[in-house]
Amino acid sequence: MAEKENTKRNRREEILQALAQMLESSDGSQRITTAKLAANVGVSEAALYRHFPSKTRMFDSLIEFIEDSLISRINLILQDEKETLNRLRLILLLLLGFAERNPGLTRIMTGHALMFEQDRLQGRINQLYERIEVQLRQVLRERKLREGEAFELDESLLASQLLAFCEGMLSRFVRTEFKYRPTQEFELRWPLLVAQLH
């Protein structure tokens, strides 16, 4: 029984990896169909539906992976790092680095791969960005408690500016067909971002 569960889990992961790979190699102008996905995995469409009730559920699973990966690592950063600017820098690098290592998933994160899918999926991505923005805002607000110094500008404005920078870098990554890496020149850009915070 355990072996059957492992086989099923492995097949599910194989399907999700194939979908992510197809998103990476696709220009996003055409919908990825279950027929194309099944052919890519080497199974029938019926076999796909034994593992996922719909293509929407496949995208849900990929979004869950993105959420779990980012939020759990943000929590680790907040646990391990105490200095505000280091926390912000590491969170931004996490988001940009995750996208860089997962180009197919970046198409989901930018909404590019969701154009032909259910609106609910875009809503989930919007919620993910809202959660990240809340975390950034909290880090900014905690500066006064941790370091005895507050930012001059409103923390909500600063958090949205930092997130907008990341979203812009992810969009550029997708637009350039993954040639312009999100982390490219980050160390040169970071002082510019810090200057905006003061």
Swiss-Prot record:
Required for nucleoid occlusion (NO) phenomenon, which prevents Z-ring formation and cell division over the nucleoid. Acts as a DNA-associated cell division inhibitor that binds simultaneously chromosomal DNA and FtsZ, and disrupts the assembly of FtsZ polymers. SlmA-DNA-binding sequences (SBS) are dispersed on non-Ter regions of the chromosome, preventing FtsZ polymerization at these regions. Its main location: cytoplasm. One of its GO terms (cellular component) is cytoplasm. Residues 33-52 bind DNA. This is Nucleoid occlusion factor SlmA. SUPFAM superfamilies: Homeodomain-like (SSF46689), Tetracyclin repressor-like, C-terminal domain (SSF48498). One of its GO terms (molecular function) is DNA-binding transcription factor activity. GO terms for biological process: cell division; negative regulation of division septum assembly. Disulfide bonds: none annotated. It is found in: Cytoplasm, Nucleoid. Residues 9-70 form the HTH tetR-type domain. The keyword tRNA processing does not apply. Belongs to the nucleoid occlusion factor SlmA family. Homodimer. Interacts with FtsZ.
